[in-house]
Amino acid sequence: MHIIFQYPIVDLRDIVSGGNGRLNDPKWPDPQERRQSFVSGFGKVKSRNLGGSDNFTGESYYCDSHSAIKFKELQHQGFSEGITTPASIFNSYRRYYNDGRFVGKVEIGLIDNLEKIIRNYPGSEGIQISSILKHYSNLEATVEDEQVKLYKAGPRLSKKYQRESTLREKHFQINPDYVQTGELTIVLTYSSHERLIVPRRSFSLEKIELPNDAGSIELFGYKLKQDGYPTKVWIIKIPANFRSKSGKHKTILRDLRMNLLRIHLEKETIKILLNAIKYKQIELEKESAEAKQVNAYFEQTSKKLFRKSRYDIKQENLLDFALQSEKSMDKGSFNSLKENITYFQDEFMLDNLGKLVGSMAVKPMLFVCSNPRDSNFIDFDKEYKDLKYNLQRAIDRDHYDIEIELSVTKDEFKDILDRYKPQFLHLSMHATVKDGLHFEDKNKAILPMSVKEFKQIIERYTKKHELKLVLISACNSKNHAKAIKEYCDFAIGTKAVFPVPAALIYSNNFYTTLFNGYQKDLEYCHSGAINAIEFNNPKFDDLDYKNKKIRVHEIPVLIKNSKYV
């Protein structure tokens, strides 16, 4: 089993006036330059035994950084839970890479014999990969004479790098804002075995068929949480006999691992650069060499990030998960930031940066309820609690912010949208074909909102804000959904009276799927929800559909914006 911990380190000192005491050559301008020592205290540039990958020539050399992070008796700290003989770590590496500008990373690799033990000492008890990840994430190492667990080592390594790359007489002037660490990511590769169990909350991202009918490589995404530290994990499952495969097959695996690590590093670097500009940690003058350097990096990297594939590895299906960030940026902040970075003129690049920030941003969701007096009671509390419960258990639980507004009047609706700025809007209320959506007035009496009025409010809102989804959980609301289809990505309404039990099943299943990595596949969320209604066959007393031509699971209707048709 091979586990890689990647710690991005972004050095902004090249684009900060004054130099800040940085050594003349602590960076890595050319991988061929391996004669000089690299960063004092980190190590020296060496050749890789495997020569890197055909597609990543810059990986042919690395900085051996054993002096930066140290372990004690590492070989005896292998995984032991649920097996008769503890695993041992028989190989490890600690490496620093740098692109010669401001992008760096420390990668720690651990290779154990757990798979060999499982094969030689068979048993019936399953071994959770989540337990293996927790074990190795909690290994202790020494950085700058301090003990630290691996999943918390990033800031220490960043501090160590900054210190070792600064002139001694300038150590007292070190500014931690100029060298920052990005979020940790982990890549775990294992051979398929019935006892090794992929985490229940992981989800499949890609399946790569190997040449010559040699099986397939499967890729899963997973969020590992420890003490409030969420870590993005890539789990790669390879065929059981993969070790005996040809060099071409192994190159595919290496390229996949490198691509995952590079996407993460590029995303973290862009995030740190944007935040540094936003909070004025760095100030770039138009047409300056520093502004041009940042502009060039943004332009090149944003193009690479949004390609459909890179080095023959498809990355389209990976990006939703890859571009998520635990320390999110606010998309509104990016819009105001864009107004201030006038030295960035490339609209295509700015559009890509906007998409990247959108992927990293927390998605605001607003739950709007209205239940005028003399209407049948709607149990909003049940629907909302189910929604929150599903979010807490979900993979993407940290990427949605849910707000609820009860007893909303017709006059308040517009102002509530402006206040919360939702990307996902859920309306739960009664409605009729003749009158429209049943909002309340100030006396809690019914005050309907027509299709025309609803359209005008949504049209106005989307001139300033993005709406990905409007879900109208109300009877006979198809016309309202249809009227706003050009102002949001997707709208969901109903084409008949929608019984409450069926509505609860739909909502529960739709959001469970959405929160588990499918925010860009709302059609998939919708189809799963209507299937759940059909399979559950909910009982209800308010209507008898036996003599109707329409079936209950056919009542919810998904309407697409024309750009998706």
From Swiss-Prot:
Gene Ontology BP term (one): defense response to virus
Annotated keywords: Antiviral defense, Hydrolase, Protease
Name the domain of life.
Bacteria
- Give the enzyme's EC designation: 3.4.-.-
State which residue ranges cross the membrane. Answer: none
Q: Which GO terms describe its molecular function?
A: peptidase activity
Which top EC class applies here? hydrolase
Q: What does this protein do?
A: Probably a dedicated protease for substrate gasdermin bGSDM; cleaves the bGSDM precursor, releasing the pore-forming moiety, which integrates into the membrane and triggers cell death. Involved in defense against bacteriophages. Expression of bGSDM and this neighboring protease is not toxic in E.coli.
This protein's name: Probable protease Gilli_2517
Name the source organism: Gillisia limnaea (strain DSM 15749 / LMG 21470 / R-8282)
